[in-house]
Amino acid sequence: MDMPSLEEQIELIERGCVDCISRDELVKKLKKSAETGIPLKVKAGFDPTAPDLHLGHTVLLQKLKQFQDLGHQVIFLIGDFTGMIGDPTGKSETRKALTVEQVAENAETYKKQVFKILDPEKTTVAFNSTWLSKLTAHEMIQLASELTVARMLEREDFKNRYESGKPISIHEFMYPLIQGYDSVALEADVEIGGTDQRFNVLMGRDLQRSRGQAPQVVLTLPLLEGLDGVNKMSKSLGNYIGITEDADSIYGKVLSVSDDLMFRYYELLSDLTTAEIADLRAQMEAGTLHPKEVKKQLARELTARYHSEEAAIAAEQNFENVFKKGGIPEDLPEYQVSLDEPIWLPKLLADAEMVKSTSEGRRMIKQGAVSLDGEKAVDESMLISPEGEVLIKVGKRRFVKVIFA
C-alpha cells in the first residue's frame, strides 16, 4: 500500500479530534520523520483501574492504530504507578487507591485485550513505574515546584471540590505532574488523550519544554457516548459495549444505538474513510439506504474486529432469527445442574451466568426482562423445580437452556 500524502495523513490524524495542539508542530514532525526515516513516538496512557476495555477506550486505541499504520512507533503506556494514586480527573471526591497486586492483575488483562486492535509487533508496552518509582524525594519536590496551586485550581473538578469544602489530597495535585513526566521519560512526540485529560497531557508539553525537549503534539479525542446516548460510555453506568463480549452481544448492542448517535460511532470507531462515511450519510438522507442497513454495516465491522468475519455473519443471522423470525439462537448455550430441591430463580440466573448477582437477577425480574419458556417471570421470589428443562431469556438477546440432571 502506498504511503498517503502529507495532507492525507493530517486529515486522517485529525479525524475525530477535538484539539490538535498544534497543527503546525504536527506537520513539522511528520515532515521531519519522512525526511529522516525516524518514526514518531506516539503514546497514550491507560491507568489499569478498570481492566475490561469497552468501545469508549478504543477511540484512543483506534487513533494509535492509525499512527501505527502510518509507520510510527506506538507506545501503549500502562500507568501501573499512577494507577496506585488514582486519576482525580472529573471526580467529586478522592479516589480509593489500588493495591500493587490489583494494578498488576489489571495491567495483564489490558495487555491481552489491546492487541485485538494494535499490532503487537509494532507496539511498545511500557509501565510508568519503570521511571517513576526511581524518582528521589529531591526530584519529586523539584517536579512539584513547576506547578502552582492557583493553576491547579483552574481545573473545574478541583475548583468545585475546593469551593464546596470537599477535601483534596496533595497526592491528587501531583497526578498531572507525574503523568506529564511520563512524556519526558519517553521523549514522546505525540500524546493522545480524551478531552477530560486535556490539562494532564498539556502538562507533558510544559515539562518537556522546561527540560529542553521538543514539546509533544497533543491530540484530544471526545468521550464516546454510551448506549443511552447521554452519558459517556461507562461500565458503572451499564451503557457500554465490551470488546471481550461475545459476537452476538456486540452485534446486538451496536444495532441498539440510536440513529442520532450512529454516525458519531462511525466517525470515532469505523475504519471507513471520511468520504465513505459521508456517502453512507448521503444515501440514508436521500432515502436510498435504510438507517437499519447503515447500522448493520457498522455492527458487522465492529463484531468482526473483535471476533472474526465469520462470527459477525453468524451474529447477524442469529439476530435475524431471534428478532425477525421470533426464534431462538441456533447455538443455544446450555447449563446443566443437579439439584435435590427447588432453586430460587435469581440464584439460578446468577449460577447460569445470565446476571452477575442475585440482586441483578431480582432487578431484571422486576423490570419484566426475564422469561421462562416464553412466559414472563413476574415473581422475584419464584422457585424453580429441578425437573426436565427450562428455556430462560434475559433481556432481548440472552438465552440459556437449563437442563436439570
Swiss-Prot record:
Subunit structure: Homodimer.
Keywords of this entry: Aminoacyl-tRNA synthetase, ATP-binding, Cytoplasm, Ligase, Nucleotide-binding, Protein biosynthesis, RNA-binding
Motif interval(s): 'HIGH' region: 48-57
Keyword Cytoplasm applies: yes
Domain (S4 RNA-binding): residue spans on this chain: 343-404
Species of origin: Desulfotalea psychrophila (strain LSv54 / DSM 12343)
Function noted in UniProt: Catalyzes the attachment of tyrosine to tRNA(Tyr) in a two-step reaction: tyrosine is first activated by ATP to form Tyr-AMP and then transferred to the acceptor end of tRNA(Tyr).
Lineage, uppermost ranks: Bacteria, Pseudomonadati, Thermodesulfobacteriota, Desulfobulbia, Desulfobulbales
Residues binding ATP: K235
Name of this protein: Tyrosine--tRNA ligase
